[in-house]
Amino acid sequence: MTPKILKVLAMLPLAGMAAALPAAADCALFTSLVKQAETGRGFEEVVPFRSVWDLRESRDTVPADYALPGFDVCWVEDEIWRPDQSDYGAPRYVCRISEKVEATGALSFDSHMAQLRAMGQLSQSVEACVQADERFKLDRKTTSGTSYIMKPELTGNRGMYQNPRAELKISPMVGQYTLTGAPDALPADMRMPMQLDVIIAGPARNLQE
């Protein structure tokens, strides 16, 4: 399942489908989150920054007021690596929405398509917020998503990982699932339940400085 397919599905009507369209993304909240990402302090207005000795290798769920509308869960984490006995990392704000399946792992074709359409609409609404922010430019498009980066000329021409970034990623859900009622001709990459992640990342830094 590629972002392009998701975008096409988002343009199809939802009439007769089971899933409701999620609420549109809040661009004011997006702008606020980017401002916090720029500080490099780990979205401390959303959840308290711990310390360089207590980094968020596990997720800190964000309060409802700071969650992008339409998603199942939002959290803050620290992407950490440790070269030369130092702690480097990049704070990340992540929101995720996943398809809803039955407890048995079964998912009907109609529900699957409706949820993908709704997910596509939600993805487009968030991407519209990113594109409306003139500080961002397209970084790359891949089969799994789209990445935007704050223009380096606005941040002193720092390298890519020294700039705030916004990413939209679509990926298969982990687990065993059974899609029922699907046409035989349905491509394999459209038979798996999917999840959508929106990531707003701050600049990488030496966390011990």
Go through the PLM ranges and name each one.
Residues 21-94:
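N-terminal leader/targeting segments
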Residues 1-10:
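Bacterial N-terminal signal peptides that target proteins for export
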Residues 26-32, 40-55, 112-113, 135-157:
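Negatively charged, low-complexity tracts enriched in Asp/Glu with abundant Ser/Thr
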Residues 192-209:
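Short, low-complexity, Pro/Ser/Thr/Gly-rich segments in the mature regions of secreted, periplasmic
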Residues 183-189:
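Short, exposed beta-strand-loop hairpins at the edges of beta-sheets
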Residues 53-70, 139-167, 173-175:
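Ser/Thr-rich, low-complexity intrinsically disordered terminal regions
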Residues 9-18:
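Bacterial N-terminal signal peptides
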Residues 69-150, 154:
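Long, charged/polar, surface-exposed segments that mediate recognition or autoinhibition
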